[in-house]
Amino acid sequence: MPINSKQKGARGEREFASLCKEHGFDVRRTQQYCGNTGDASDCVGLPNIHIEVKRVQALNVDKAMAQAIHDSEHKNVMPIVAHRKNNAKWLITMRADDWFEMYKESRLSNGS
């Protein structure tokens, strides 16, 4: 029996939150954390990041990124799409300008 897309989306959000916790970040699904707050982010707990989670086999990256950008407008946060296919690792998609901004602030950019 196939799982419906809402259940699969919720499962993907829990999986991504768990991955974040494995890396030391206290991330939770938005609904589980605070109900319907008007925050369209799928998960919360990474300050200044709008997280759109997609758990699909065939992702339309442009559409998913457009949704993340739209939902993060006027919030001064960086939109990302966290996505994973079956039997694959999680990937993060973000705008190049945002990636360069993060890289400049990281320890990696100074060779440490």
Predicted segments, located by residue:
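Catalytic phosphate/metal-binding cores of nucleic-acid and nucleotide-processing enzymes, i.e., regions
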Residues: 1-112
